[in-house]
């Protein structure tokens, strides 16, 4: 098995053992949705952001809980990017089925013409959330601080004016743009901006997570002892 495959398998086993995590993955976005179910646009946007916060928080918890074994894995020959990519794939594999399930729920429960765009909205939000949680997990040593920091990011994204620069530099701005295209049936430019922002943010977050983990897990190089030849 490849190093990435081994990390994916270990991460999936870890998540599957925590029933509370599985309940959180399903319940929290659903609560976000039901609170605003009578308002079509707001309910879908709340569902997407709830899914993003949940997936990123699970990614954060996985990264923080694995800190104790990361250095041992590095000593065993695993590169830092093996750990980041493997866990990212595992968390994404947990989130994408939920994105499909919630997309089906919206198709049945709401009168939306662009259902495919809603599913795209949920998928891109999930893909952004996994490396976002990894970045916070690499930066912050405790899961409580990381979860609160993610909550601040989410709240700021919800409250900021989408046209302002602050909203555009936050990771879930693509969620708002693609959501506007899917729900309000605006022009293609909203979709194009959202997809472009998603792609750039996704690549940036993955690169940041790998860079931070590489620095944090770098191995100290011990110089080889110098052998001196004694005289007769």
Question: Can you name each region flagged by the protein language model?
Answer:
Residues 1-34, 222-231:
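Aromatic- and glycine-rich beta-strand/loop motifs that create alpha-glucan
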Residues 3, 162-192:
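Short hydrophobic, aromatic-rich alpha-helical segments embedded in or entering the lipid bilayer
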Residues 15, 57-80, 87:
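Transmembrane helix boundary and interhelical loop/hinge segments in multi-pass membrane proteins
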Residues 23-26, 36-37, 55-56, 120, ...:
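Alpha-helical transmembrane segments of multi-pass membrane transporters/translocases
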Residues 35, 60, 97, 101-105, ...:
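Alpha-helical membrane-inserting segments
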Residues 35-38, 140-173:
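Transmembrane helix segments
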Residues 42-65:
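Long, hydrophobic alpha-helical segments
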Residues 88-140, 195:
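Alpha-helical transmembrane segments and their short interhelical loops
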